[in-house]
Design a protein with these regions (language model features):
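Enzymes that bind and transform nitrogen-containing heteroaromatic metabolites
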Residues: 1-159
């Protein structure tokens, strides 16, 4: 099962200069809690942008240039990943924008933190087709002068 997890702005802003725009302590703690002891899927740029290793997570990386190491398993494409046994695992898709977009058709669920703010960005979260997903707000929060809500999107079952 693939679950996208991200923090975005009200206009789908995701990142600027290969960095996250918002660093909300409570949201980062939520991210750790949800993804701990699971696989996390990311692109090469997201891997290289991490300030430190995400303890307790197993990395899957999509990259045409990196090679598998003891720290992460590399796939040359999403198609290559989808043909493996990992498809039966709970995998959290953690970015970046291109990986979110490419994984959207295969995603069962999305957990999005949506900040009620806009910001200059050079990377955006893909547009969600509301005919494919049911959404539920699971919480509304305030932190450091920011208001944000957490929404879960679940793919609608085909008739």
């Amino acid at each position: 099962m693939y679950t996208i997890i991200a923090c975005i702005g009200k206009n789908n802003e995701l990142g600027l200069n290969n960095k996250l725009i918002w660093h909300i302590k409570e949201d980062l703690e939520f991210f750790k809690l949800v993804t701990y002891n699971h696989y996390v899927l990311m692109g090469r740029n997201t891997l290289l942008s991490l300030p430190k290793k995400l303890e307790g997570r197993k990395y899957l990386v999509i990259s045409k240039t990196l090679e598998t190491t003891e720290d992460y398993r590399v796939f040359k494409s999403i198609d290559e990943l989808l043909r493996t046994d990992f498809a039966s695992e709970n995998i959290y898709v953690i970015g970046g924008a291109k990986i979110y977009e490419e994984m959207m058709p295969y995603t069962d669920r999305m957990i999005l933190t949506i900040v009620d703010d806009s910001h200059v960005a050079d990377k955006y979260f893909p547009i969600i087709n509301n005919e494919e997903f049911i959404s539920d707000v699971i919480g509304e929060y305030h932190s450091d002068d920011l208001t944000y809500k957490r929404k879960i999107y679940t793919r609608k079952k085909e008739d």
